[in-house]
Amino acid sequence: MLTHSTRRWLAGLGVAGAFVAASASPALAAAKEAPLELGVYFSDTTLATGSEGKIDSPLLFASGPVVVEGLTVTYDYTDLDGTVQVKRDSAGTECESPKAGVLVCTEHFEIGLDEWAFGGLFSVVMTPTAKAADGDTGVLKVTVSAEGLTPASHSAKIRIGEGVDLAAPGEESMLSATPGSKFSAPLTLSNAGETAAKGAVAVFDLDYAIRPDKQYSNCTYEDGRLLTCSFSEVTAPGETRSAAVPYVLGKDTYAPGSDYGYYNWMTPAEFEDFSTYLQAGGYSMGQPGKGSVLTLPTVPSKAAARGFQADTDPMNNWSGMTVKVTGKNGADLVAIGDKLTGKAGDVVTANVGVRNDGPAALDFGRGGSPVTKIDVAVPAGTTAVEVPEVCAPLNGDQQDWENAGKPGAKLYRCYPDIFIGVGEEQTVEIGLRIDKVIPNAEGTVTINAKCECEGFTEDLKPANDVAKILVNAAAGQGGGDGGALPITGQSTGLLAGLGALLLAAGVGGYLVAKRRRTRFVA
């Protein structure tokens, strides 16, 4: 379930998070009892005439967890009628061409698949031939197969277009603001190629704190967040266009600190390919704003023509800003315990976790780490028999993620989301079997664990970082947080598979790199 602004705009347009296979193929989610089915997705792609082409790989998944042998991907590009050549890019994959227009690649090691699509295997380079001309289009049929399973196919649209080189400033804007204050940042486009760029689309990756102060009709928004802006202006070779985009820093921004925002330029055709990819995963591109049109006027340019390219190096398509947040605006995370009753043999459910009492939200989306750790000590006389996958047995400061979700441990460490808003609760349900009735049996919920690990360390009120789990408490015994029963409300849920990243239609790799501020290698 995507609950927080389409999972923070796909966890920052690395589409990090939740392209679940069932989203692209709803039938796969219909019944867990059905036979296992393979699935494959390959992005629509636009190639520039005369260019070296593009490298991409299919997204592979299954309707349930399975380890397969003889995993094979077949690329059938006969429909492209000699305008595109498809060749192996991965040195470790064995490929052969049984006939013209067909490439068959096989992995000889066992491969694990599940509902979470992943890319990187069977990557190919798609190169326009000398025959290719602007306006050519065709279908690349991609089929996945494995021993004992029915093959699955997906047809991707391949188009040939004119080559351009969109570029953004190489340096980020350095800004400063306090929570609740307004500021503006430049949105700049240069044409560093030799062909006029007929329109462009900016795709934004903004931290939660950075919000639009004004809406425009040629931009799209979701839950108050700026997602994209489309421009129809023709940018001549060597020309630069720029606009000042107004923003406001949210009042619930953590301070002091830093927040980041990036934008990436795409041609309209590339953006259409990207949109198709996102829509296949069930993600919203937002709604047009209710304001005037944001224009990109020309400005004095220092851009120089760099030869005929089609954005083959996406690193010159992005730029952004760093906002130094000044002032003081912290957060108080509160442990949530529970109070349970039952007789011997009963299985009772402890709903435990963390609540953010503010005044600031916590956004760890850049690093991808959970906002805190939730350590759960099982009460005496009970056994944990139902444990979610986001909880792992804990031994000292070491969590055993190989046995995540395994019942029977006395101590667990659970991971909440990478973001928590003010007033938001994130809880996990643990089923406890009462083996022996012990009056006032007590367990604990501890957040902000002191460990050599990532997480929040500057809690405003450490005194409420521990709450009790009471089983068969005597009258007058407190439970939950602060002695009261927990406020359950609607949890945003805990993210399983925090490291599940996938490549996004030719832009995901470098966008993930920008979010994590490290180099991404597919």
Regions picked out by a protein language model, each given a short descriptive name:
Residues 1, 27-53, 60-63, 85-102:
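Low-complexity, acidic Ser/Thr/Pro-rich repeat tracts that form intrinsically disordered stalk/linker regions
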Residues 30-35, 62-64, 142-166, 266-330, ...:
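Extracellular/luminal low-complexity Ser/Thr/Pro-rich, glycosylation-prone repeat/linker regions
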Residues 108-135, 232-276, 415-444:
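Low-complexity, intrinsically disordered segments enriched in Ser/Thr together with acidic residues
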Residues 31-35, 68-112, 199-236, 369-413:
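A surface/secretory-pathway sequence property marking extracellular, secreted
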Residues 1, 497-522:
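C-terminal membrane-anchoring or membrane-association module
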Residues 19-28:
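C-terminal segment of classical bacterial N-terminal signal peptides
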Residues 314-484:
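Membrane-proximal extracellular "stem/stalk" segments
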Residues 38-69, 171-196, 336-370:
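Short beta-strand elements of extracellular/lumenal beta-sandwich folds
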